A protein has these predicted regions:
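Short, aromatic-rich amphipathic segments at membrane interfaces
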Residues: 116, 143-167
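Acidic, S/T/G-rich, low-cysteine, solvent-exposed domains in lumenal/extracellular/periplasmic regions
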Residues: 1-140
Length: 168
């Protein structure tokens, strides 16, 4: 899924977990321009837990030769998806301690313009990620929510835009 007319502006699938429960239940979109797939190894410590937060669709693909790219269409040699573009990693340590890391593969996830295009959902995801990493056993969390007076932007994936353009 991507923004209409711009296949590099991804609208990844939001996987259901502690970080994304609020976003996935509200059918929100996350916008990740120029995201790269995160490759996880099959061979890692038993104490690690890796959860997918954001994934691309089954029809996604990764361009191999971006510097000499002539088209955004899929070409032979391009890598088939789906890809993970956001992951949460946790590890249980001694003395009931835990390490928690969240990694997103697009720095523009933090961009104000990208956040506005999805009516604040990107910043909600970042806030939920920080909240997950900072939560502790007594249940205290971080809350940075604010009420925006901005207007909402209607985000329409490319397939839906093509469908509705027939009627307009």
């Amino acid at each position: 899924h991507y923004i209409s007319q711009n296949p590099s502006y991804l609208l990844p699938n939001i996987e259901s977990n502690d970080i994304t429960s609020n976003l996935s239940s509200q059918s929100r979109y996350i916008l990740m321009p120029l995201a790269q797939g995160i490759e996880t190894t099959d061979n890692y410590r038993d104490t690690l837990t890796i959860q997918n937060i954001l994934t691309t669709s089954d029809s996604s693909y990764s361009k191999v030769n971006v510097e000499n790219m002539q088209t955004m269409e899929k070409e032979s040699g391009d890598i088939d998806g789906p890809f993970h573009v956001g992951v949460a990693i946790s590890e249980d340590l001694e003395d009931d301690k835990q390490t928690q890391i969240v990694y997103y593969s697009s720095e523009t996830l933090f961009n104000d313009n990208m956040n506005t295009m999805v009516s604040g959902a990107n910043f909600e995801l970042i806030s939920a990620s920080v909240n997950w990493m900072c939560s502790n056993e007594d249940g205290s969390t971080i809350s940075i929510s604010s009420k925006s007076l901005d207007t909402s932007t209607l985000t329409i994936p490319a397939a839906d835009a093509s469908f509705w353009s027939i009627f307009v």
